[in-house]
From Swiss-Prot:
It is found in: Cytoplasm; Nucleus. This is Major vault protein. PROSITE patterns: IQ, MVP. Residues 349-368 are annotated as: Disordered. It comes from Danio rerio. It comes from the Eukaryota. GO terms for biological process: brain development; eye development; neuron projection regeneration. Required for normal vault structure. Vaults are multi-subunit structures that may act as scaffolds for proteins involved in signal transduction. Vaults may also play a role in nucleo-cytoplasmic transport. Pfam families: MVP_shoulder (PF11978), Vault (PF01505), Vault_2 (PF17794), Vault_3 (PF17795), Vault_4 (PF17796). CDD domains: ATP-synt_Fo_b, MVP_shoulder. Keywords: Cytoplasm, Nucleus, Repeat, Ribonucleoprotein. GO terms for cellular component: cytoplasm; nucleus; ribonucleoprotein complex. The gene is mvp.
Length: 863
């Protein structure tokens, strides 16, 4: 609002160094009015803006004016005929430090007052000409030219020149260089003619300021070379290196410390890598592939052996075969199998003969042809030449008396076993792996004792990997035998334990596949050794009597092989004539038992089971007496005894009925015993409850007595209190105060005495109650102990009286009542004799027959 009011005012006061623009509305021309001035505005004039401060450019500053006014040689502003200021339209004018000046109509400030740019030492401004002009020194500049304004100095801008960038000098330190590239053809700072894109290096220590047409590509640091590091470089274009040697494109070489201590790669060199020194000690060597010859060129396809002590750098194109290798130091128990790669004369093999042929002046070598194999034995220190290839390192194999290895001659193919001596394979021998059947491998790998672990077939034993080149050995336990068959000789040999059996290259174990489990199943037991016994085997068989009673028998047989030591070859071979002697023997015995039992009744079998089974198994001799054993003539197996472990009915209904009758008898006896014990316990419990109630009544009476005494004391206290009050009322009113005080004192004493009496009575009551409660607890615990003792005595007496009252005959009748009923039921079915037993409580019939025979013999003696 103030500015608008000021512009509309007729009188405008212009301070010093201020100005305004006044527009003549008749001619439409603006002019400048400069203060200090009091300007009176005419009616046809309009002030365009309020007084504005003149432009002030301080020293070392400048500003840029757009559309500047035209001035004459004396610096005066030029006007046209109408009085308007002449302007250089679209032109610029840079004004430096001067007196304050106004902006004429049409002039604009394109760039405000700005400090002049100071160019410091080792820096420069890269300038570019926008227009053709001539500098004060007479040098002509064409639009597009670029040059440098180097410091130190202050840059005065021109309208024809623009500043592209500020360039700083690059500091070059020791062992450094800068790589430059020419952006335009011309001379560099050294005066050398450069073409566009050309690169060169400057390694002079100090600050380097690139020229206007130069650009810094990179700062290259020198590679410090030592005795342990070298530089592998490659030429990327033909040039002459620092050593004065001409290099071709693609050529590679090493720069070592012998050439220079620090190497700065030139623009024509490419660093491939840093090569470490290869150091060999006195016990190392290496084989260099494609070695560089004396002419500096790699000899492709050749090898060179270098032995320590030595340090060297691998030249470009060279590489080590298998790296740095240790020299072969062989002892007396070691050797090397060598093969010739090329034909040569071997002098290494004659070193052992030199000691015996010292008289010979000239040493003769051995001619080796490509592919020849030979063995070098220790002790020796050996470095294989380039014409020899090391195939194997042999080490002597120490063998004990019971150890051996399989050796095959690779020329003849024959395999032999070397046992009991330290042996080193020759160049024509190799270890041979003996393959065994899978079942034999598993049996040998298991750490199972054939005798102690013969029944642990379900348990898994630890298995160790077998060395197939070692001679297969097996320790035969005591009282056992093993059969080994030689397939080349077609012979078998039998060995008896304790012994160590070792297989030849063509020998194999005879594996026995025996029956096992209960009942017997074939191919359950796999074993190599055959136990000679004595031992036992158990089998379960099912038989049927003449009256069709099916029974299941579990029998155990004691067996052994009848063999006299030392045994001849025929007897030993007969042991393995029957592959499954267990299954065959069990089947034969089961067949005999079934045949014998099928012709007898169940009742007879029940009474004479042992005699029937033994006679069926062993048979009778000439005197009609049961034999003591059963012998199998094929392999000499002898069955010495038969143990009847259990006899159970096969029919489920018979088994259930028998079990039910036994359980019923047991339940009747148990229920009667439980009823008597329950009655006795209830009686004792009632007696204890009565004593407990009596004790409670006694305790209550004592408590009431104590309460009565308390009430009497309270009544006496009340009487004393009332008497004192009446006596005080009868006395004169004159002594009322004294009497009242004495009465109060007496009343307090009586109250305290009453409270004391009440507390004492309560304490006595509580003590009596606690004492009675403790006595009650003690009596309860004592009664509980007596109760348990009496219950135990009653139970023992009850059982004793029960047994005495029942009597032996009654118990027998009770025991026979159920079975006789079952027998009668079975007889009603047409069965002549039966045997009923509980499946969970089997009847042992092993001594039944002997008991019957013993009773008969006793009767005969009595008669």
């Amino acid at each position: 609002m103030d500015a608008d009011h000021l512009l509309g005012a007729s009188i405008i006061r212009i301070p010093p160094h201020h100005y305004i623009h006044v527009l003549d509305q008749n001619t439409n021309i603006a002019r400048v009015e400069i203060g200090p001035l009091t300007y009176i505005r005419q009616d046809n004039e309009r002030v365009l803006f309020a007084p504005v401060r003149m432009m002030m450019v301080p020293p070392r500053h400048y500003c840029v004016v757009l559309n500047p006014a035209v001035r004459d040689d004396e610096g005066q502003v030029q006007f046209d005929g109408s009085g308007q200021v002449k302007l250089r339209h679209a032109d610029l004018e840079i004004r430096l430090a001067q007196d304050p000046f106004p902006l004429y109509p049409g002039e604009e400030i394109q760039k405000d007052v700005t400090p002049l740019q100071i160019v410091y030492p080792d820096t420069a401004l890269r300038l570019q000409a926008l227009l053709d002009f001539e500098e004060e020194g007479g040098e002509k500049r064409v639009a597009g030219d670029e040059w440098l304004f180097e410091g130190p100095g202050t840059y005065i801008p021109r309208k024809e020149v623009t500043v592209l960038e500020v360039i700083k000098a690059t500091v070059i330190r020791e062992n450094q260089a800068i790589r430059l590239r020419a952006r335009k053809e011309g001379l560099d700072r050294s005066g050398v003619q450069r073409v566009t894109g050309e690169e060169w290096q400057v390694s002079k220590v100090g600050a380097y300021l690139p020229g206007a047409h130069e650009e810094v590509v990179d700062i290259v640091s020198a590679f410090i070379l030592t005795d342990k590091k070298a530089l592998h470089v490659r030429a990327i274009r033909p040039f002459r290196d620092a050593g004065g040697r001409d290099r071709r494109t693609g050529e590679e070489w090493l720069v070592t410390v012998a050439d220079r201590e620090a190497h700065i790669p030139s623009v024509a060199e490419e660093v491939v890598g840093v090569v470490d020194v290869t150091t060999l000690n006195s016990r190392q060597y290496c084989v260099i592939m494609d070695p560089v010859g004396a002419d500096g060129k790699p000899q492709l396809g050749q090898k060179r052996v270098v032995k320590g002590e030595r340090s060297f750098f691998l030249m470009p194109g060279e590489h080590l075969e298998n790296g740095i290798q240790d020299v072969y130091v062989l002892s007396e128990e070691e050797g090397l199998v060598l093969r010739a790669v090329e034909a040569f004369i071997d002098t290494q093999g004659d070193e052992a003969e030199e000691e015996e042929r010292e008289s010979r002046a000239k040493k003769r070598g051995v001619q080796r042809r490509p592919g020849d194999r030979w063995m070098l034995r220790g002790p020796i220190e050996y470095v294989p030449p380039a014409t020899v290839e090391v195939l194997l390192t042999r080490t002597a194999i120490p063998l004990d008396e019971n150890e051996g290895i399989y050796v095959r001659d690779i020329k003849t193919g024959k395999v032999r076993a070397v046992i009991g001596q330290t042996y080193m394979l020759t160049q024509d021998e190799e270890l041979w792996e003996k393959e065994l059947p899978a079942n034999v491998e598993s049996l040998l790998a298991q750490s199972r004792d054939p005798l102690a672990d013969r029944s642990d077939r379900g348990r898994s034993f630890g298995q160790a990997e077998r060395d197939k080149t070692r001679v297969v050995s097996y320790r035969i336990p005591h009282n056992a035998t093993v059969q080994v068959y030689d397939y080349r000789e077609k012979k078998a040999r039998v060995m008896f334990g304790p012994e160590m059996v070792m297989l030849g290259p063509d020998e194999q174990f005879t594996v026995l596949s025996l029956s096992g489990d209960k009942p017997k199943r074939p191919n359950v037991i796999k074993t190599i050794c055959l136990l000679l016994g004595p031992d036992f085997c158990t089998d379960i068989i099912t038989i049927e009597t003449a009256d069709h009673a099916r029974l299941q028998l579990q029998l155990s047989y004691n067996w052994h092989f009848d063999l006299k030591q030392p045994a001849d070859a025929a007897q030993a071979a007969a042991l393995f004539s029957v592959p499954d002697f267990v299954g065959d023997a069990c089947k034969a015995i089961a067949s005999r038992i079934r045949g014998a039992v099928a012709s007898v009744q169940f009742d007879d079998f029940h009474k004479n089971s042992n005699r029937i089974i033994c006679s069926a198994v062993f048979g009778f001799d000439e005197k009609l007496a049961v034999r003591s054993s059963l012998r199998f003539g094929q392999n000499g197996l002898v069955i010495s005894s038969v143990d009847i472990q259990s006899v159970e009915p096969v029919d489920q209904r018979t088994r259930d009925a028998l079990q039910k009758s036994v359980q019923l008898a047991i339940e009747i006896t148990t229920n009667s015993q439980e009823a008597a014990a329950r009655h006795e316990a209830e009686r004792l419990e009632q007696e204890a409850r009565g004593r407990l109630e009596r004790q409670k009544i006694t305790d209550q009476a004592e408590a009431e007595k104590a309460r009565k005494e308390l009430l009497e004391l309270e009544a006496q206290s009340a009487a004393v209190e009332s008497t004192g009050a009446a006596k005080a009322e009868a006395q004169s009113r004159a002594e009322a105060a004294r009497i009242q005080g004495e009465a109060a004192v007496e009343e307090a004493k009586l109250k305290a005495e009453a409270q004391k009496i009440e507390a004492d009575s309560e304490l006595a009551r509580l003590c009596k109650a606690r004492e009675q409660e403790l006595n009650y607890k003690k009596q309860i615990d004592h009664l509980e102990v007596e109760k348990q003792q009496k219950l135990a005595d009653i139970e023992s007496q009850r059982f004793k009286h029960l047994m005495d009252n029942l009597g032996t005959e009654t118990l027998k009748e009770m025991a026979r009542a159920g079975p006789e009923l079952q027998v009668k039921l079975l007889q009603s079915l047409g069965l002549k004799s039966t045997l009923i037993t509980d499946g969970s409580s089997p009847i042992n019939l092993f001594t039944t027959a002997n008991g019957l025979l013993g009773s008969l013999q006793g009767k005969d003696k009595d008669e």
